[in-house]
From Swiss-Prot:
UniProt-recorded name of the protein: Exocyst complex component 4
Any one of the GO BP annotations: border follicle cell migration
Region called Disordered, residue ranges: 434-480
Role this protein plays: Component of the exocyst complex involved in the docking of exocytic vesicles with fusion sites on the plasma membrane. Involved in regulation of synaptic microtubule formation, and also regulation of synaptic growth and glutamate receptor trafficking. Does not appear to be required for basal neurotransmission.
Positions bearing Phosphoserine: 235, 456, 459, 682, 686
Coiled coil: 36-70
Highest taxon above the source species: Eukaryota
Family: Belongs to the SEC8 family.
Disruption phenotype: Flies exhibit defects in development of glutamatergic neuromuscular junctions (NMJs): increase in synaptic microtubule density.
GO cellular component terms, A-Z: apical plasma membrane; basal plasma membrane; cytoplasm; exocyst; growth cone membrane; membrane; plasma membrane; presynapse
């Protein structure tokens, strides 16, 4: 055996179900033999199979011979192991038989011992306490009977007398321990039953009474456990029943013999108030008999919060199922009902405390003093805070707080509910338990949602149950087993922080009543008031509304495309607008309207909200001004836009704002603001100017702009070439004007009393409700600044159109002099610069018509014909000589501009006829010019006519100075002026 143990040979190849192994091979052989048609084929198949078998036999012999030594070792070992296994089985069988014999012997001995012990105990009990036990054993049955009839005073007296006997003369008797324990257990059970009945009276019935007034029917009250049997009874029966109940209450208030007292049946308890008073008195009297007054007081005080939570949960469920709040705000209705229920419960607590005081004096109870209604309302505020925590979604916004590890009073349990909740993970869950038997059914409706609070709620409920279970002597941890479960909460609507805006004013009314109940001193608000104030300031405003305002400004300041993105056509229609606005402006206006609604909903925080609004508007003002500078200011600082530079000139700006067309436009804008709802989409024209006044105004403007134009002209870099830039400026103007109007309306609304649509502002907000005049003034000034920016944009557009006329129609003399002579352009077409100008004017009109109000487009293009006419006439100053082709080209220029401007303004621009008539004069001889002036009258200035005479003389080769002087003298005589000095402009 010194040789190493044999090793298991490697496992051979496992053949599959193919032709060379197992049954598959045999089947194939049978098939091949079956399909063979001749004996020769079968013989060949046989030989083939025999050859295969020979090869297999040879391989088997080879393997056996190769592993002969190992096989020789394995076979003896196998025989040895087999024999040892057989011997072990025989030994185990013998042990099993021996164990069976021992078991039977022990069973026989145990029965004998048990029988002897039971006989001895029974004999002892029978000899010592048979008669006493027989009497005491009747007590449990009597207690059960009294309890079934709800005669709690009789049951309490029977238990108290029996326990007094057991703890007195029979205290040393050990055989009565079971009976004593049973009676103590029954006393505890009766105490639990009485406590449940008291809770039902104080909380359930009081709450149902308040709930029934809200619901359509009083079925819940009719089905109440203590108000059964309110059937149709005669008035005399009702009077007699009420008299018996009042008599019983009067007897209980004094010392009375229970055996002689009249038993009041449930059928006699007709009126809920008498029923409640009677049962409360009965239960408190029973507590006094059972010596449970201190325990019951402590349990009631500790359990106020839990029972109020149950009332809230039950009421929420009832309102959700009945659909009573379908047409109103569900949370408002819920709060209204709950507060009425709390007041009814507080009234019942007041009655309960009076009975406790009477019973405590009657039985000389020594223990803790009864709680008062201040304690109740403190717990009620905690429950309301829990309710608001659920609906305001505070767990997702509250800051991290450390959980309290211990507390002395259950009233401090409320702090555990305000721990930060874990934010739900966005990852998909790996497992689902929706098919598990432990998963409850869920209602997917929006109005009825139920879920469990997290582990912090469970810990609170466990601590509360521990407090209840540890109260009183002999109390067990299972006093209120339902308290061990996690508290389920039912929501009547989806949690949302914005709900505070709908419930704030009603809540403030409830808080005022609570502070009156608790007799809070001025400047010392109740805890619910502090909770609501802290939530609104620290969470709803700081982390909600104010944060949204800051994010809006940050997004606008970082987004470069915010000044190019306009609102959609659907938004234009929704806002009752006719022109597009910047999306950023509408976004800020929405934030403004949100704040306006918040001021109406939260009037006590109007100053805080207005401070944030002013900061928002100031930041947006800076952004808008920066956007305006980005539009009109080129990249290079040494460049300038001519129209912007003109507008910065105070004289030009003041002159434009004093013109009648500007004042008329602003007057119309102000009227349209006041009458937007009545005259939307139309306008009543103000007092129209006469044609002469319009002509004089346009001439004044053209003269002023011409006089301020430099000698060098206007280059391509000094104009806004891109139409898209002008369109952006127009949209900015329209947006700023609209936004200014909205801000002004908002400021004007602040002057009126802030009243919510549901309730007037509560008195406690009176000190803060008046918005300061300084704040309103700041808002008004901001509105004026936005309006001023809109005016600036409009004036820039007004001047830019005129600057481009100067740019395209007035070039340097070196460029314009005789530029038409030898030109390759079609002589029947206007000048190329004029063609470019007319095209740009049409493009600008198209852009402005799509972005500006028609009155503003009219203001931009009105008077442009007078300026163009003046520029065309002044262009003659740069002509060295005149010919027919030049005159025709200049006339076509005037006609082209006239057609374009007439299409834009929808009126024939007669001012350009003057330019055409001027160049027609240049084709005449000097005498003809003077005769034409005598016949038609003059419509040009003296300088223009002098220039025309000089060009005419050059054209006809007149160079005699005396003749030129005579023509000038004749012109002066015609004009009635002094002789000219011969200066040509």
């Amino acid at each position: 055996m010194d040789a190493p143990p044999p090793t298991k040979p490697p496992r051979g190849v496992k053949y599959g179900k193919d032709e060379s192994a197992g049954c598959g091979f045999l089947v194939n052989v049978i098939k091949s033999l079956g399909f063979s048609e001749t004996t020769e084929e079968r013989q060949k198949e046989k030989q083939k199979i025999e050859a295969e078998f020979k090869r297999s036999d040879l391989r088997l012999n080879e393997l056996v011979s190769r592993h002969d030594q190992q096989l020789t070792q394995v076979l003896p070992l196998f025989s040895q192991v087999s024999s040892e296994v057989t011997a072990s089985r025989e030994r185990i069988h013998a042990v099993k038989e021996n164990l069976g014999v021992c078991k039977r012997l022990l069973q026989c001995r145990r029965d004998e011992l048990r029988k002897m012990w039971m006989d001895a105990v029974q004999h002892k009990y029978v000899l010592e306490m048979l008669e006493q036990i027989q009497e005491l054993r009747k007590v449990p049955q009597r207690v059960v009977g009294y309890t079934a009839k709800r005669q709690y005073l009789h049951a309490s007296k029977a238990l108290t007398d029996a326990l007094t006997t057991l703890n007195g003369p029979l205290q040393a008797v050990e055989g009565l321990s079971d009976l004593r324990t049973d009676l103590q257990t029954r006393r505890q059970q009766l105490y639990q039953r009485l406590h449940e009945e008291l809770v039902t009276q104080v909380y359930t019935n009081s709450a149902n009474e308040a709930l029934s007034s809200f619901q359509r029917t009083n079925s819940s009250r009719l089905n109440s456990s203590f108000t059964r049997g309110i059937g149709a009874r005669r008035s005399t029966d009702r009077i007699e029943a009420n008299a018996r109940v009042r008599k019983a209450l009067a007897e209980m208030a004094q010392s009375f013999d229970l055996d002689k007292a009249e038993v009041i049946e449930d059928a006699d308890l007709i009126y809920p108030e008498l029923s409640m008073s009677y049962f409360v008195a009965i239960i408190v009297e029973s507590f006094g008999m059972l010596h449970k007054v201190p325990d019951s007081l402590e349990t009631l005080r500790v359990q106020i919060q839990t029972e109020l939570l149950n009332v809230v949960r039950h009421t929420t469920h009832q309102l959700s199922v009945s659909g009573a709040t379908a047409d109103t705000n569900p949370l408002l209705s819920l709060l209204e009902v709950i507060f009425k229920q709390f007041k009814a419960i507080a009234k019942t607590h007041s009655l309960l405390l009076k009975n406790y005081l009477s019973v405590g004096q009657k039985y000389s109870v020594v223990g803790p003093q009864p709680y008062d209604l201040t304690d109740f309302w403190a717990q009620a505020q905690s429950v309301l805070q829990l309710l608001l925590t659920d609906y305001l979604d505070i767990q997702n916004a509250a800051a991290d707080e450390s959980a309290q590890t211990g507390f002395s009073e259950p009233t401090s349990n409320i702090n555990s509910y305000f721990l930060r909740r874990k934010v739900p993970s966005t990852k998909r869950s790996m497992f689902k338990f929706d098919k598990s038997s432990h998963v409850g059914t869920s209602n997917n409706s929006d109005a009825f949602k139920e879920h469990r609070r997290n582990a912090s709620d469970a810990s609170v409920d466990d601590n509360l149950a521990g407090q209840l279970g540890g109260s009183g002597k002999g109390s067990t941890s299972g006093l209120f087993p339902h308290e061990k479960k996690q508290r389920e909460k039912i929501l009547i609507c989806t949690p949302d922080q914005s709900i505070i805006t709908k419930v704030y004013l009603p809540l403030m009314g409830y808080i005022k009543e609570i502070e009156n109940f608790m007799k809070c001193k001025p400047g010392q608000p109740c805890s619910l008031h502090d909770f609501l104030d802290n939530y609104i300031k620290d969470t709803f405003l700081t982390k909600g509304h104010n944060r949204n305002l800051q994010l809006t400004i940050e997004s606008l300041s970082k987004n470069q495309d915010a000044w190019r993105t306009i609102i959609s056509p659907e938004e234009i229609k929704a806002l009752n607008l006719s022109r597009p606005l910047l999306q950023s402006t509408v976004m800020v206006e929405r934030r403004l309207m949100e704040t306006k609604n918040l001021i109406q909903d939260l009037p006590c925080y109007s100053e805080d909200l207005l401070k944030m609004v002013c900061a928002l508007l100031k930041a947006y003002r800076e952004i808008c001004q920066a956007a305006y500078r980005g539009i009109v200011q080129p990249d290079s600082e040494d460049k300038r836009i001519y129209s912007v530079a003109w507008l910065k000139d105070e004289d030009i700006s003041r002159f434009l704002k004093t013109l009648p067309n500007w004042t008329d436009l602003k007057t119309y804008s102000q009227k349209s603001r006041h009458n937007r709802k009545l005259h939307r989409g139309s306008f009543e024209p103000s007092e129209e100017e006469s044609p002469l006044q319009v002509q004089q105004r346009n001439i004044r403007e053209a003269e002023m702009l011409t006089s301020n134009l430099g000698e060098g002209g206007i280059t391509q870099q000094e104009i806004l070439v891109e139409i898209s830039v002008l369109k952006e400026l127009a949209i900015l103007q329209e947006s700023m004007e609209w936004f200014s109007c909205r801000v002004s309306e908002f400021a004007n609304d602040l002057r009126r009393p802030l009243v919510n649509g549901l309730n007037a502002v509560p008195a406690e907000c009176g000190a803060d409700i008046a918005v300061k005049d300084g704040t309103i003034k700041v808002m008004t000034n901001l509105a004026l600044e936005f309006d001023e920016l809109a005016n600036t944009c409009l004036l820039v557009l007004h001047l830019e159109v005129r600057v481009q006329c100067f740019h395209y129609l007035r070039s340097k003399s070196s460029v314009r002099t005789n530029s038409y002579v030898g030109s390759k352009d079609d002589i029947l077409e206007p000048d190329r610069q004029v063609q470019v100008l007319t095209k740009r004017l049409s493009e600008m009109d198209e852009a402005f018509s799509a972005t500006l109000h028609p009155r503003k487009t009219r203001y931009i293009f009105e008077g442009l014909a007078h300026l163009a006419s003046r520029i065309l006439i002044q262009a003659s100053n740069y002509l060295e000589h005149i010919d027919q082709i030049t005159v025709q080209r200049m006339c076509r220029n005037a006609i082209a501009l006239q057609q374009t401007l007439s299409n834009i303004t929808a009126s024939r621009e007669v001012a350009l006829d003057q330019a055409r008539h001027f160049y027609e004069l240049l084709c005449m001889e000097p005498d003809e010019i003077l005769n034409a002036l005598l016949e038609r009258g003059t419509q040009f200035s003296e300088m223009q006519l002098l220039n025309a005479l000089q060009l005419s003389c050059k054209s006809f080769g007149i160079t005699d100075a005396n003749l030129l002087a005579s023509y000038q003298q004749k012109l002066s005589d015609i004009l009635g002026a002094k002789p000219s000095k011969g200066v040509v402009v």
